[in-house]
């Protein structure tokens, strides 16, 4: 019998906010245990939640980016279950009428384009974390993560292969980073995926019994987990057994899924409206104000890049979204191709020599544009621009002061340059004669000698012009 795989996804993205969804605690990753947990995060009596406005804004940004409906009135609800890392005994989430509904994301697969329907995206708070082995033989609880704002993005069961799932997740991962709503760090848990997988005979409309796969933190492991679980369910059904509804844990070392617990349905959580939180009202004016601040959609950005850049250059920018954002700021001022060359040839190569990773904070776009302006005004040469960049990386200060400190101002005095060139021609009579005899490539020799004699300070445009004039006398 031929079996068809049916998959729906639940992706939890941690929103990039400085504070938590309902408390003022910080959300920095990697801090000492329980140093970023307010009384509310610990579930202490008498504490009340206050909604983080920035989390709402980021949820709306996502909804607009996937062409979804933004709910004008949505509600927070209590999702009731017991787990040690859930201090309150419930999680504040959204059940009916979530903030984002009915979106879509188009993916590219080996069979062509496919549209994946997004059923909903709702806000909820993250749970704490169980820490095993910190104290020998015991489990500790770290509530630093408790209350961190999550956006849970739920698809319809539209996937029919692991390839489609990975394509969607990569596209979604790229999108949320591009929008600036999530850093996408899978190792730190900022982008987590649960896979709901079932199988059915090919051509059958009715869905099979699904298993939920958890603990998958890389695209490669997601592919492996899906293929393993598909084979497991086929084996169970073909041997006369029944697939049970359960949550299964993926073990990357053993490349297998293991039963974790029975999978709950929505009614098991006994959702009810949170009495401490008013309905969330979003106006048309608020939505319009966010639309005006939205970056280009990734498809629109890609189309613009392809119009002006080579394929390899486009792929480089699309796979490095922080660099792409930086590039956009520079390109709008000096043009697409010059901006790419300045960033890759001058800036990134200088960063590499300094053994530093690219970050828009190291040399802000405004600083690079100021350096470029000095080159365009013939104040410094293109070659010396790298020295200015390197000095700024090492000790940030005013660009004008760096140019003065390094003595990089170009010499544009025509009389001085002409005298320099005449001296070089006089010192190299054989090369001058060869040039006049037709060996025009020697032009670069004289230009190089002039630039060397001026210690790189002579204006190269003037040097070229004057060398040509003097040799052709």
Curated annotation (Swiss-Prot):
Gene3D superfamilies on file: 1.10.10.410
GO molecular function annotations of the record = asparaginyl-tRNA synthase (glutamine-hydrolyzing) activity; ATP binding; glutaminyl-tRNA synthase (glutamine-hydrolyzing) activity
Q: What class of enzyme is it?
A: ligase
Catalytic activity, as annotated: L-glutamyl-tRNA(Gln) + L-glutamine + ATP + H2O = L-glutaminyl-tRNA(Gln) + L-glutamate + ADP + phosphate + H(+); L-aspartyl-tRNA(Asn) + L-glutamine + ATP + H2O = L-asparaginyl-tRNA(Asn) + L-glutamate + ADP + phosphate + 2 H(+)
Which domain of life does this protein belong to?
Bacteria
Task: Identify one Pfam family in the record.
Answer: GatB_Yqey
Q: Which GO terms describe its biological process?
A: glutaminyl-tRNAGln biosynthesis via transamidation; translation
UniProt keywords, alphabetically: ATP-binding, Ligase, Nucleotide-binding, Protein biosynthesis
Q: What family does this belong to?
A: Belongs to the GatB/GatE family. GatB subfamily.
What exactly does this protein do? Allows the formation of correctly charged Asn-tRNA(Asn) or Gln-tRNA(Gln) through the transamidation of misacylated Asp-tRNA(Asn) or Glu-tRNA(Gln) in organisms which lack either or both of asparaginyl-tRNA or glutaminyl-tRNA synthetases. The reaction takes place in the presence of glutamine and ATP through an activated phospho-Asp-tRNA(Asn) or phospho-Glu-tRNA(Gln).
Quaternary structure and partners: Heterotrimer of A, B and C subunits.
Q: What protein name applies here?
A: Aspartyl/glutamyl-tRNA(Asn/Gln) amidotransferase subunit B
- What organism does the UniProt record list as the source? Francisella tularensis subsp. mediasiatica (strain FSC147)
Q: Its gene?
A: gatB
């Amino acid at each position: 019998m031929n079996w068809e795989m049916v998959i729906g996804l639940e992706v939890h993205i941690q929103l990039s906010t400085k504070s938590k969804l309902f408390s003022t605690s910080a959300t920095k990753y990697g801090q000492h245990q329980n140093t970023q947990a307010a009384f509310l995060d610990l579930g202490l009596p008498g504490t009340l939640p206050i909604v983080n406005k920035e989390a709402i804004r980021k949820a709306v940004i996502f909804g607009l980016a996937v062409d979804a409906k933004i709910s004008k009135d949505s509600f927070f609800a209590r999702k009731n279950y017991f787990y040690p890392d859930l201090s309150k005994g419930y999680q504040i989430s959204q059940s009916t009428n979530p903030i984002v509904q009915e979106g879509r994301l188009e993916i590219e697969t080996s069979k062509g384009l496919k549209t994946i329907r997004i059923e909903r995206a709702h806000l909820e708070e993250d749970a704490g974390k169980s820490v095993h082995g910190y104290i020998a033989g015991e489990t500790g609880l770290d509530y630093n993560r408790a209350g961190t704002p999550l956006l849970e993005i739920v698809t319809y069961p539209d996937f029919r292969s692991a390839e489609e799932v990975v394509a969607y997740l990569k596209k979604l991962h790229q999108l949320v980073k591009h929008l600036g709503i999530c850093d996408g760090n899978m190792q730190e848990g900022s982008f987590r995926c649960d896979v709901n997988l079932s199988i059915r005979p090919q051509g059958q409309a009715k869905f099979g019994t699904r298993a939920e796969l958890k603990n998958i933190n890389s695209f490669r492991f997601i592919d492996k987990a899906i293929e393993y679980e598909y084979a497991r369910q086929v084996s169970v059904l073909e041997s006369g057994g029944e697939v049970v509804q359960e949550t299964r844990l993926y073990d990357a070392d053993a490349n297998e899924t293991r039963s974790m617990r029975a999978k709950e349905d929505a009614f098991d959580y006994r959702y009810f409206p949170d009495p401490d939180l008013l309905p969330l009202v979003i106006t048309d004016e608020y939505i319009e104000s966010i639309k005006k601040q939205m970056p280009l959609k990734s498809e629109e950005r890609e189309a613009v890049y392809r119009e002006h850049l080579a394929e390899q250059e486009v792929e480089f920018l699309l796979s490095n979204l922080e660099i792409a954002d930086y590039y956009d700021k520079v390109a709008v001022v000096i043009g697409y191709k010059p901006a790419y060359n300045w960033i890759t040839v001058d800036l990134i190569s200088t960063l590499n020599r300094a053994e530093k990773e690219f970050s828009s904070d190291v040399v802000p776009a405004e600083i690079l544009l100021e350096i470029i302006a000095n080159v365009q005004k013939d104040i410094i040469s293109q070659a010396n621009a790298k020295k200015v960049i390197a000095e700024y990386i090492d000790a940030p200060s005013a660009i004008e002061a760096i140019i003065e400190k390094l003595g990089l101002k170009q010499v544009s005095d025509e009389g001085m340059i002409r005298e320099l060139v005449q001296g070089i021609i006089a010192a190299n009579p054989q090369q001058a004669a060869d040039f006049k005899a037709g060996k025009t490539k020697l032009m670069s020799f004289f230009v190089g000698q002039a630039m060397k004699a001026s210690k790189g300070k002579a204006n190269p445009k003037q040097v070229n012009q004057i060398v040509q004039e003097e040799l052709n006398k």
